[in-house]
Swiss-Prot record:
GO terms for cellular component: nucleus. This is DNA ligase 6. The gene is LIG6. One of its GO terms (molecular function) is ATP binding. Disruption phenotype: Normal vegetative growth and fertility. Slightly enhanced sensitivity to X-rays, leading to a slight root growth reduction after 100-Gy dose of X-ray irradiation. Delayed germination of seeds, especially upon cold and oxidative stress (e.g. by menadione, a genotoxic agent), and reduced seed longevity and storability. Increased DNA damage response in germinating seeds, probably due to accumulation of DNA damage in seeds. Increased stable root transformation susceptibility by A.tumefaciens A208 T-DNA. Mostly expressed in buds and flowers, and, to a lower extent, in stems, leaves, siliques and seeds. The lineage of its organism: Eukaryota, Viridiplantae, Streptophyta, Embryophyta, Tracheophyta.
């Protein structure tokens, strides 16, 4: 039928629907004819050159075809409109005034559009079903959508301007069914360029049953309740759900009552004439009602029993049963068919849907294997590249043809290079699966099998110039073993961003190296691989491609083992993806074998079952045969699954002696390597002799001797060892399953470092060794026993894997680097929770509920850990791998860093065994909660060295007393060495090198590595330190309200500044660096000082400012130094001690001598810039409690300190016991602060109004509490501070019981005023007495808001709980006015006069 015929009406189309001649339609001519028939005087429209701007999800690429979108601003004669079905959300915009273009649709939909919507028939063109039609040069086929009457899927084969075709499937709304797999037209679109997919239920929670099951349920309910005076109501759309109505009428043998509108619709569809439907309400008790009559279904079902009761009474029935057939109300539940009851009414939520559920969508994409999926529902289609679209497309990762996309990408290199060389005689077409049989004759005339001899030159020639430059840079940056193909794949993955390329490379370095080390595959091998992607319905060669180009298409060995986005795929999706590939590859002819040696094709790697090959023999079927027959079986199986057997042996680290046994297992598993591994590990006693010493060692797959709890006798143990019986810990075991006995709990004298370890000498240490120790230490209350366990753990590491000792120490101490390196994981609880959700397949709400109950994310992870079935069990976690991964996480910054961190964490989690995930999560959260930190780990490390050396070398030379002395001496030396040189990178290797000769003199202080600061004890008054300093000379110094700083000068002149925690803060104080350089003596080439940095107001006589002022100073970082010009808060440094100068360690010198050396380093000072701490000296003869002059002098000095805005004073011994002791808190240093002195500290009466869940030791309790005062003017509670000190464990337990049930509020009351957001809110019930150091202005807390500062409240620094106040009601607590007055009364406060 010619496209320019005048009969472009519905009736005209009907008359030609059976015509065997192919329809060839021209939309512009049809539109011109339609316009002319309506108004002959109407000028013929001018064809437009392009389609109006529309969403990508509505437009077919490279065409002017628009699907299901009719609200365009103007008409266009060249635009072809396609309507998939007659539902209002798809035909919105159509009306009787439509004249914007020609509408193509099915016959039934055309009738509905014309008769119901009154769209002029001249603009509606009905297309035949299952028949190819050419429209504007493109081929279009309509097939059944299984949605509603007249609903169709559109198959578009679009001709490109240059040459070739692109294929697209537009599903409209559809429900996938098995019949579609056999549709010949749809089969022709396997491997298409894109699928515009109905993603209504693209969510794993929507997996409702089949339509047949749902219809059967409705019919069974009607048959079961068929009584008199029972009315059945079925909710449906105006068009839709007809299938369920027809089945009810047919199987229940009764008519269906519909209203006039529904009847007219059914008549148009041809259903009303079958006698199944009636408008007479008295003819049947099954009535159809509107969609929302029985209740609202979105976003969740809300029944409308009121309306149901009205209908029941109006129609005179005693009972009413409603059915709401929809998938929206269904999620994975125990009861598929939920029922709501009320009185004599019930509503059945029937999971009947005419849209595909989640699994069906994935099956459909798996069947078609398109290059991409374009969602059409459930996202903002105006933002096609938005995150929601990308997130939805990830549901189909592994199901789309990603390899074809890579081929197209690399072929683009060839095209660009070919065009530059003006080799235009080769017509390159990228989509080989799209060529029809009639085009075979147009194939390249050259013919033959001209295969390039080398891939190297081709790759070089086909790379664009920009990528060539990038390749050169990558060759300089990456290791030499990285192949050019791998570089190209990385360039594509990261859009040429070299930073992302390099960072992602190192994330997957091990996998890339393993791939690069495989033999180079032959081109024939790759030809087989790519041929697997072409279905039997499309066997034709590519049109117009010369053999050279075909060879390139088939010859590229793109990375297949590594998926750079695999971290974003959920466990369920990963498993299904693997399964889909396996099933597809299994259909291939087993006789097709690659030629020559090389890397196995994907078919062979994923192959599970060979189709009845002659070599496939079941071991189980030969159990009665003689040994010779069994050997033949093994040989045959080995030949049939040779490559799988090789892989199996490699995974379990077996030798050739294991081959026969492995072949029998693999044959029993029919080539399924995962099943074979399960058999191997479930039947360990059957493993033949395979001596451990003969097995290869691998850093990724290790075997560990299995000594179960049941093997108590030495005979069993020896039998296990002699059999070579070993277990690979990559086998999933539950926490409750019997695991290797944890021998670290043995007494040190009975522990054998090598025999009791779970790995062998020379192998890398498994992470499970640490985890089992952590679990034992966690359950052990005694510190001595815990140290013994840690000692045993380290002994095995020293004996078997000394290179893993340092990473193990870091993991035991919850560190990944020395403090001064400022390297942190920088991950929060939300990221850990998100990774846990993906790794374990649980919901966020479940994680939150479990965390609220358990209070520890590690316990949550352990509880919800699930077995995840993968193609190959993941390798066991190694100590060094866990540590290196944590270091990788710490360096991830910038765009995409959160995703990369999450991927690394998920990868670790999925490899966890036993309790590994519990302690891994705790490590990520920086809280192991085993009660063993550095003070326990370091002595255990020293003990391990002595124990191993004693038993190995000195058993006869050392007496018991000497041994004990050495044990304690080395342990103490390790701790002391770390205090003066807190770098495990230095201490641990030195300890291993010196062995039992290690001592404190082994290491010395190093400028640039801060030592641990000396600490002071608290004194509650002046008299207290007189009692401790009788007849001993001492000094009193101001205790400044600033930041403790340790200042180092390095040999190269560099000045570094460290905080009291060892964090480097040099970038925050560039002005201080200049001051140190200016005033230090040139002769002092290196030194280490102890000082306090204080904010100062140099304009107002160098007045000292509060710590609050100093905290407003910019912090800076290694990558962003602040400049002296940008500094707004000036500082003065008060130096008071020196620990190291010019290579000499001064720690043992008395303070008096250290002061003298300090003044040699700084002979001059300058007020407001660098000063010595203000002090007074008390001689030994004056240090007496009876000396009232001295007592008065010190009291005056203390008051002077308060008036100078200091926290208090420091009292230090000058001569006796006056050394500098890192980390020590001794009587040699005492501190007297305002809130420690009786009579000086004011207390507040505050009300707890909320709390957070505790962490660490306080897990399961509430800590901290949010405290508030009361403002009687506004009648509201205003927050003052968080309190987390001063409580006992008994008090925590009491408060957990007290604040429960009705005392916990669902949300913050309107009369609570705060910027805090605690985990839960409490009703105002009790009053507590709180004491703090002083008051400060707060942007978060709201106490006294407007009374002191116009926009900020007042808070308390260092608050602590004193006691309960039982004689006051909550409204009688401290008021906002009280707090304001106390703020003004304090001597040290932030200057807020200039604040606005």
């Amino acid at each position: 039928m010619a496209s320019d015929s005048a009969g472009a009406t519905i009736s005209g189309n009907f008359s030609n629907s059976d015509n065997s001649e192919t329809l060839n339609l021209n939309t512009t001519k049809l539109y011109s004819s339609a316009i002319s028939s309506i108004s002959p005087q109407f000028p013929s429209p001018k064809p437009t050159s392009s389609c109006p701007s529309i969403p990508n999800s509505k437009r077919i690429p490279n065409t002017n075809f628009i699907v299901d979108l009719f609200r365009l601003p103007h008409q266009s004669s060249s635009v072809a409109f396609f309507l998939s079905h007659f539902h209002s959300d798809h035909y919105s915009g159509l009306s009787s005034s439509w004249s914007k273009g020609i509408i193509y649709c099915s016959h039934k939909t055309a009738r509905l559009v014309a008769e119901i919507l009154q769209v002029p028939s001249q603009f509606v063109f009905a297309l035949p079903m299952n028949q190819m039609v050419k429209i504007d040069g493109s081929e279009v086929v309509l097939i059944e959508a299984n949605h509603c009457p007249g609903a169709v899927q559109f198959l578009f084969k679009v001709k490109l301007e240059s040459s070739g075709f692109e294929k697209y499937v537009h599903t409209g709304d559809f429900r996938f069914c098995d019949e579609m797999r056999f549709d010949p037209f749809l089969n022709g679109f396997v491997g298409c360029d894109g699928v515009f997919l109905d993603t209504t239920y693209c969510n794993p929670k929507f997996v409702f049953p089949s339509q047949e099951e749902s219809v059967g349920y409705v019919v069974s309910v009607i048959d079961k309740i068929s009584e008199e005076k029972v009315l059945f109501l079925v909710a449906t759309y105006v068009v839709g759900k007809e299938k369920i109505l027809v089945e009810i009428a047919r199987r229940c043998k009764r008519k269906i009552v519909v209203d006039a509108r529904k009847m007219s619709m059914l008549s148009v569809l041809g259903c009303g004439e079958e006698g199944m439907f009636t408008e007479d309400e008295n003819e049947s008790d099954v009535h159809v009602v509107g969609w929302n009559v029985l209740g609202e279904t979105w976003p969740y079902f809300r029944p409308n029993f009121v309306k149901m009761n009205e209908i029941m009474v109006e129609k005179g029935y005693d009972k009413v049963v409603g059915f709401v057939p929809t998938g929206w109300t269904y999620e994975v539940k125990r009861n598929k068919f939920a029922v709501r009851f009320k009185d004599s009414m019930e509503i059945h939520l029937v999971p009947y849907s005419e849209h595909s559920n989640y699994d069906e969508l994935r099956e459909f994409i798996k069947f078609l294997k398109p290059k991409r999926v374009i969602p059409t529902v459930g996202v903002d289609i105006e933002k096609f590249d938005c995150k929601e679209v990308n997130k939805m497309q990830k549901h189909f990762s592994g199901l789309v043809d990603e390899m074809a996309n890579k081929k197209d990408f690399l072929l683009g290199f060839y095209r660009q290079s070919y065009q530059k060389n003006e080799k235009s005689d080769v017509d390159v077409v990228s989509h080989s699966a799209e060529v029809y049989e009639e085009e075979e004759k147009n194939a390249c005339e050259d013919g033959g099998e001209n295969v390039p001899s080398s891939r190297g030159p081709i790759l070089h020639d086909t790379t664009p110039s920009s990528d060539s430059r990038l390749l050169i840079k990558l060759r300089d940056s990456l290791p030499a073993w990285v192949t050019e193909e791998q570089m190209l794949d990385l360039i594509k993955k990261h859009a040429g961003n070299p930073v992302d390329i390099v960072s992602n490379f190192y994330e997957y370095e091990a996998e890339l190296y393993k791939q690069a080390s495989l033999p180079t595959p032959s081109l024939n091998n790759q030809a087989v691989l790519f041929d697997d992607d072409v279905t039997d319905l499309q066997p034709n060669p590519v049109k117009g491609i010369c053999p050279d180009v075909q060879a390139i298409q088939k010859g590229f060995d793109l990375p297949r083992k590594m998926n750079l986005t695999k971290g974003t795929i959920s466990p369920g999706k990963r498993g299904k993806s693997s399964g889909s590939k396996s099933n597809k590859k299994a259909k291939k002819d087993p006789k097709s074998k690659p030629v020559g040696p090389g890397q196995p094709t994907l078919f062979k790697f994923f192959n599970k079952v060979l189709d009845g090959g002659s070599n496939s023999v079941s071991v189980g079927s030969e159990t009665e045969e003689c040994n010779t027959d069994k050997k033949m079986v093994h040989i045959d199986a080995s030949e049939a699954y040779k490559e799988v057997t090789d892989q199996f042996i490699d995974i379990v680290n077996g030798s050739e002696s294991l081959r026969d046994y492995a072949a029998s297992i693999i044959d029993e598993a029919k080539g399924d390597i995962s099943r074979a591994l399960n058999i191997y590990y479930s039947k360990p006693r059957e493993i033949p002799g395979d001596h451990a010493g003969e097995r290869g060692l691998s850093s990724k797959t290790i075997q560990y001797p299995k000594c179960s709890e049941a093997c108590s006798s030495q005979e069993d143990k020896k039998a296990s060892e002699n059999s070579g019986h070993a277990v690979n810990i990559c086998v999933q075991t539950s926490a409750e399953e019997s695991v290797d006995k944890n021998y670290v709990s043995l007494p040190p004298e009975k522990y054998q470092p090598k025999e009791h370890a779970c790995w062998r000498e020379g192998q890398p240490a498994p992470y499970i060794h640490l985890v089992r120790t952590f679990a034992s230490v966690e359950s052990e209350k005694g510190k001595i026993k815990a140290m013994s366990m840690l000692c045993n753990m380290f002994r095995s590491l020293f004996a078997l894997s000394p290179e893993d000792v340092l990473p193990a120490v870091y993991l035991c101490t919850n560190k990944i680097a020395a403090d001064h390196e400022n390297i942190e994981l920088n991950i929060g609880g939300s990221l850990i929770s998100s990774a846990l959700e993906e790794a374990c397949g649980i919901s966020r709400s479940t994680v939150r509920d479990m965390y609220n109950s358990l209070g520890d994310l590690g316990d949550v992870a352990q509880l919800c850990r699930q077995t995840q079935k993968l193609l190959v069990p993941p390798p066991p976690l190694l100590v060094r791998d866990v540590f290196s991964t944590l270091r990788k996480i710490s360096v991830q910054t910038g765009t995409g860093s959160t995703r990369l961190k999450k991927n690394l964490i998920v990868k670790l989690m999925r490899s966890c065994r036993e309790k590994e995930i519990k302690f891994l999560v705790r490590t990520l959260a920086r809280n192991l909660r085993i009660g063993a930190m550095l003070r326990t780990v370091l002595p255990a490390l020293g003990r391990a060295i002595v124990m191993n050396s004693f038993w190995n070398d000195h058993n006869k030379e050392l007496s018991e007393s000497c041994f004990r002395e050495k044990l304690e001496g080395v342990s103490a030396a390790v701790v002391e060495a770390y205090n003066i040189l807190p770098s495990l990178d230095v201490v641990v290797p030195s300890l291993m090198d010196k062995d039992i000769e290690f001592s404190t003199s082994t290491l010395s202080m190093v400028p640039g590595i801060p030592i641990k600061p000396m600490l002071a004890k608290i004194a509650k008054g002046v008299q207290e330190f007189f009692n401790l300093s009788q007849e001993k000379a001492f000094t009193c110094e101001y205790k400044y309200d600033g930041q403790r700083a340790q200042i180092h000068k390095l040999l190269d002149g560099t000045v570094c500044i460290f905080s009291r925690n060892g964090d480097e803060t040099t970038s925050r104080f560039p002005d201080l660096v200049d001051v140190i350089k200016q005033f230090s003596c040139p002769a002092a080439e290196t030194f280490m000082l102890d000082a306090e940095v204080v904010a100062t107001d140099r304009i107002n006589g160098n007045k000292l400012m509060s710590f609050q002022e100093l905290s407003t100073r910019e912090r800076g970082s290694k990558d962003a130094l602040i400049t002296t010009e940008s500094i707004k808060v000036e500082v003065c440094v008060f130096v008071f001690d020196i620990m190291f100068v010019n290579g000499e360690q001064l720690l043992a010198l008395p303070l008096r001598e250290r002061r003298r050396r300090l003044k040699e380093v700084f002979p001059e000072t300058r007020p407001g810039y660098l000063e010595y701490a203000k002090e007074i000296t008390v001689g030994a003869e004056e240090a007496s409690l009876n000396n009232h002059d001295t007592l008065s002098r010190i009291n005056a000095f203390l008051e002077e300190a308060f008036q100078s805005s200091c926290e208090g004073i420091m009292v230090k011994s000058l001569d006796v016991n006056a050394g500098y002791c890192p980390t020590k808190r001794s009587d040699s240093w005492l501190k007297v602060k305002r809130d420690y002195v009786d009579g000086l500290g004011d207390t507040l009466d505050l009300v707890p109004i909320g709390a957070w869940y505790g962490n660490g030791r306080k897990a399961g309790w509430y800590s901290p509490f949010l405290m508030a005062c009361f403002n009687p003017e506004t009648e509201e509670f205003q927050s003052v501070c968080r309190v987390m000190s001063g409580f006992s464990d008994a008090f925590y337990i009491e408060m957990k019981e007290f604040y429960s049930e009705d005392k916990i509020l669902a949300k913050k009351p309107p009369y609570y005023r705060t910027g805090e957001t605690p985990d839960m809110w409490f009703s105002a019930e009790v009053v507590w007495e709180i004491r703090g150091a002083d008051f400060t202005v707060s942007p978060v807390h709201s106490a006294s808001l407007g009374l002191v500062h116009p926009s900020r409240g007042i808070s308390v620094r260092f608050p602590r709980f004193i006691s309960k106040v039982t004689d006051r009601n909550p409204e009688e607590c401290s008021t906002a006015t009280d707090i304001a007055e106390m703020f003004h009364a304090q001597t040290r406060k932030m200057n807020i006069t200039s604040q606005h």
